[in-house]
Amino acid sequence: MLILNGFSSATLALITPPFLPKGGKALSQSGPDGLASITLPLPISAERGFAPALALPYSSGGGNGPFGVGWSCATMSIARRTSHGVPQYNDSDEFLGPDGEVLVQTLSTGDAPNPVTCFAYGDVSFPQSYTVTRYQPRTESSFYRLEYWVGNSNGDDFWLLHDSNGILHLLGKTAAARLSDPQAASHTAQWLVEESVTPAGEHIYYSYLAENGDNVDLNGNEAGRDRSAMRYLSKVQYGNATPAADLYLWTSATPAVQWLFTLVFDYGERGVDPQVPPAFTAQNSWLARQDPFSLYNYGFEIRLLRLCRQVLMFHHFPDELGEADTLVSRLLLEYDENPIRTQLCAARTLAYEGDGYRRAPVNNMMPPPPPPPMMGGNSSRPKSKWAIVEESKQIQALRYYSAQGYSVINKYLRGDDYPETQAKETLLSRDYLSTNEPSDEEFKNAMSVYINDIAEGLSSLPETDHRVVYRGLKLDKPALSDVLKEYTTIVNIIIDKAFMSTSPDKAWINDTILNIYLEKGHKGRILGDVAHFKGEAEMLFPPNTKLKIESIVNCGSQDFASQLSKLRLSDDATADTNRIKRIINMRVLNS
């Protein structure tokens, strides 16, 4: 019988699998090997068809790593085989390919000698010659060409993989992408993918961080250790603005390229407050984990001292978005940390709207099942019972809105372009439509009923005593004279035609902060447990909320510093207040 986190397979079989939002997550039951698995997608933006194929899979049989027990995010790699013993770092060693298959040296023939000596690749000449040895999987299934390059002058070695689809992958070209013995740099145990290029000249570049001992107590168990062998995936950059046929790393150790997309793996350098959007540039040293551990299977110590705290997706379109680095999505990871074992216990997906406002996070983790009854003996622990909670259709509509329906609904209410297919799928899945090809009138009526249900679900929530809420926006572009595109302006009264999301908790930094005063009887409601992520501090207002602009205080004015000091800013925002260009004091009108 499988025991997973203290619960028997019989108990788990009674649990209805939870609803997970769309985005690539897959929840599987135990297979013939008895292992449970789940996969979380990373917040990767689609490019022109060539984006990194990375995810965060879990296996109950997995070991510990930078994402806690059982979780991993492995990039393509080639490694020395260790199942038959510690590598000798000579010609007797065997290699494992990217798919885990043992590699064998390709036979040498008169027409195709193996190995060969190379001084160039295509039109790119090298400052030294390389001995290039071809390898292939012992059991062929992928049909790629694999070459092991060794420099005849400096001894640097790397791998070049020619995929069957024409894509070229470069592994371990620089020392930053190689796991080597710190006492013998030529003893490379693992080569990590560093760059990929398609026949069309599209590139993906992988960056890694080497362990440096920052924030680690060097006394006790850490005294005398050499920690520098470990490599952590730091950034994945793709979407090069100008196509290039050759690999950038042939001629440069760090490509100076204009990338349009960057996936950042953060190990605590940027802060993990969900109310504060992290900056693109690291602001602090990375954090040390409570349960450091070491691997010795390659004959030297590989010390793991870090946990990945979040994964961030940045876009780089300065002309279109008004800033060089724009955060669009975020996977925030939370751990149950202790000195014995660290486990990932929650993952939040946060999205950021075009105006910079953070949407409520989505909980991507299955809640733990109730404790099972003790098996045998006299136990004082009561048997667990499932509570059946019935929700109204209106509350269900509100909950779905907070999870992923907000984008479609608000664009529709504001009269902006919206994904019509997604809107129809939403209405169909929520039983507001009976066909996926409704008439215009049927679609309009279904949307009206759905929006009314959301509003009724919102109004059924209890009133609050909050008197101030905040909303951070980007108003530098378009100009302030436009106020907000989604608002209808009447003199100094603005009407938000969509649902308006605010925070009664803290104001997170943006170039404009709306400081909104509330009068008794306002229609804003705290979502709380009704939110898809339970307990989220978000106050939502129904469509057509009226707000009166009482004052606009711009940066540099006499009252700006005084007004700024009165705002309840997020904990990590104090060093970033120079981003604030203005404060707009507003009041919600109840009629």
Swiss-Prot record:
Matches recorded under SUPFAM superfamilies: ADP-ribosylation
The EC number(s) this enzyme carries: 2.4.2.31
pH and activity: Optimum pH is 7-8.
Gene Ontology terms: biological process: symbiont-mediated perturbation of host actin cytoskeleton via inhibition of actin polymerization
Pfam family, one: SpvB
Activity regulation behaviour: Inhibited by novobiocin.
Signal peptide start and end residues: none
GO cellular component: cytoplasm; extracellular region
Any one Gene Ontology molecular-function term assigned to this protein's record: toxin activity
Ligand binding (NAD(+)): R414, R471, G472, L473, K474, L475, D476, K477, E538
Every TR mART core domain range: 373-576
Protein origin, superkingdom: Bacteria
Disulfide bonds listed in the record: none
Reactions catalysed: L-arginyl-[protein] + NAD(+) = N(omega)-(ADP-D-ribosyl)-L-arginyl-[protein] + nicotinamide + H(+)
Keywords: Glycosyltransferase, NAD, NADP, Nucleotide-binding, Nucleotidyltransferase, Plasmid, Secreted, Toxin, Transferase, Virulence
Compartments reported by the entry: Secreted
UniProt keyword annotation of Transferase present: yes
Principal location listed in the UniProt entry: secreted
Active site: R471, S501, E538
Role: Mono-ADP-ribosylates eukaryotic muscle and non-muscle actin on 'Arg-177'. ADP-ribosylates all actins tested, has more activity on nonmuscle beta/gamma-actin than on muscle alpha-actin. Prefers monomeric G-actin but can weakly ADP-ribosylate F-actin. ADP-ribosylation prevents the polymerization of G-actin to F-actin, causing actin filament depolymerization, destruction of the cytoskeleton and cytotoxicity. Does not possess NAD(+)-glycohydrolase activity, unlike most mART enzymes.
Miscellaneous field: In Salmonella spp. the spv gene cluster is encoded on a highly transmissible plasmid.
NCBIfam families: PRK15244.1 (NF011780)
Family: Belongs to the SpvB family.
Official protein name in the record: Mono(ADP-ribosyl)transferase SpvB
